[in-house]
């Protein structure tokens, strides 16, 4: 089953959106298989944002993601990567549709509440950065037979 990595960023944690975000993905029918509240270190941030290392905003990305706790999650389900991207909304909150997480709660590009993997490959890489294999729980959810 497909997995994706999602992270409530420091602004989303401080604004108390963890429960709202988890509820949206559960109501959609996805299965939470890993989650933790954590402080991102500069080393982890560097790995996570490696593709932006040469860009002028790299330092700002690292500073922000390390500025407070984040809530890291792994979700599982059919089409979860693409569906999660749609549920999050466009990166720029003012362009995100109402009803999406960023459309409802985002204010600026820098503080847009949530990060989500943009492909299966990114999901695999990001899950490996933030979670050890033993931190992911594979279990049967009775609801799945009603969804898939």
UniProtKB/Swiss-Prot annotation:
List modified residues, type Phosphothreonine: 91
Enzyme class, top EC level, equals transferase
Predominant location: cytoplasm
Q: Carries keyword 4Fe-4S?
A: no
> Which cysteines link up through disulfide bonds?
none
CDD domains, sorted: NDPk_I (cd04413)
Q: Where in the cell is it found?
A: Cytoplasm
Whether Ribosomal protein counts among this entry's keywords is: no
Gene Ontology BP annotations: CTP biosynthetic process; GTP biosynthetic process; UTP biosynthetic process
In terms of NCBIfam families, this protein maps to:
PRK00668.1
Record-given protein name: Nucleoside diphosphate kinase
Annotated source species: Bacillus cereus (strain ATCC 14579 / DSM 31 / CCUG 7414 / JCM 2152 / NBRC 15305 / NCIMB 9373 / NCTC 2599 / NRRL B-3711)
């Amino acid at each position: 089953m497909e997995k994706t990595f999602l992270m409530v960023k420091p602004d989303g944690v401080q604004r108390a959106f963890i429960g709202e975000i988890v509820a949206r993905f559960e109501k959609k029918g996805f299965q939470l298989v890993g989650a933790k509240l954590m402080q991102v270190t500069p080393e982890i941030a560097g790995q996570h944002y490696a593709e932006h290392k040469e860009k002028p905003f790299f330092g700002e990305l690292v500073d922000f993601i390390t500025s407070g706790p984040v809530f890291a999650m792994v979700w599982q389900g059919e089409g979860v990567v693409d569906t999660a991207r749609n549920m999050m909304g466009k990166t720029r909150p003012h362009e995100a549709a109402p009803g999406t997480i960023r459309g409802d709660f985002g204010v600026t590009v820098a503080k847009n509440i949530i990060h989500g993997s943009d492909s299966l490959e990114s999901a695999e890489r990001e899950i490996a950065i933030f979670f050890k294999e033993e931190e992911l729980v594979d279990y049967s959810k009775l609801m799945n037979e009603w969804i898939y």
